Design a protein with these regions (language model features):
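Conserved ABC ATPase "signature" region
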Residues: 98, 102, 109-127
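Conserved catalytic motifs of ABC-family nucleotide-binding domains
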Residues: 152
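Catalytic Walker B motif of ABC-type/P-loop ATPase nucleotide-binding domains
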Residues: 156-160
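Helical segment within the ABC ATPase nucleotide-binding domain
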Residues: 171-183
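ABC ATPase "signature
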Residues: 216-217
Length: 255
């Protein structure tokens, strides 16, 4: 069974293509890394898959549901951590999670219980009563992940979850995500520029370039005998040569 399937998914902005004829196949239980250069169409794709942006053409099924027919049902069953963190700065971490759970229909006692468990799992229990505005960027990323998990989604969308956070925070988030997939708790669809981290996490990879899917499949098949970075560079055709000139850099005295 596929957690995500698209056929001919296309999005134009003012007549210009952002995503073209996308045919994604994300197996249930997979940790799927969706990669591409800046401006390749990753965020546009994620917005379409989460019901935040209507496609110009094509179809998408998420958890077996046709997005065009029942986007609200999909939104109830997925969790999303967007690139921009939309948190209430004047709430405490515990309040943020509890209220988020209640917005998904959880009773207050259950939302409170889940919030406490998530804070512990995310190593934020000691900061549960601090205002979100006093959290570091890495702590806010963890809290946003907790908000995406509190209602028990079957599919988790993560847009650049490791961007701008330190190695300790990355390690904690990575361990939690790996455990969720290993336990069969959910499917994860992730975009990231940090290929080294992605390579240690994902089971499947899709690479998008200039709005088109150029590579897709299990990680081992995509990277073949090389690294994911090497496969990525081959797929997007943007291997860089050493810059020419600049011989004046490093001179001790002006001439």
């Amino acid at each position: 069974m596929l957690a995500i399937e698209t056929r001919g998914l296309t999005r134009l902005f003012d007549g210009r293509p952002a995503v073209v004829d996308l045919a994604l196949e994300v197996p249930s239980g997979a940790f799927y890394g969706f990669l591409g250069p800046n401006g390749a169409g990753k965020s546009t794709t994620m917005k379409m898959l989460t019901g935040l942006l209507a496609p110009t053409a094509g179809q998408a099924w998420v958890l077996g549901v046709d997005l065009a027919r029942d986007a609200l049902s999909v939104k109830r069953r997925v969790g999303v951590v967007p690139d921009g963190l939309n948190l209430f700065e004047r709430l405490t971490g515990a309040e943020q999670l509890r209220i988020h759970g209640q917005l998904y229909g959880l009773a207050r006692p259950e939302a409170t219980r889940r919030a406490a468990e998530l804070l512990a799992a995310l190593e934020l229990a000691g900061d549960a009563d601090r205002l979100v505005q006093d959290y570091s960027h890495g702590m806010k990323k963890k809290l946003a992940l907790g908000c995406a998990l509190i209602h028990g989604p079957r599919l988790l969308f993560l847009d650049e979850p490791f961007e701008g956070i330190d190695a300790v925070a990355v390690s904690g988030i990575r361990s939690l995500l790996q455990d969720l997939v290993a336990r069969g708790a959910m499917t994860i669809f992730l975009t990231s520029h940090v290929l080294e981290v992605v390579e240690r996490l994902v089971t499947h990879v899709g690479i998008i370039h200039r709005g088109r899917l150029v590579v897709q499949g299990p990680l081992d098949a995509v990277r073949a005998s090389g690294t994911l970075e090497e496969s990525f560079i081959r797929a997007v055709g943007e291997e860089r040569t050493a810059p020419q000139g600049l011989s004046w850099l490093g001179r001790t005295e002006p001439t």
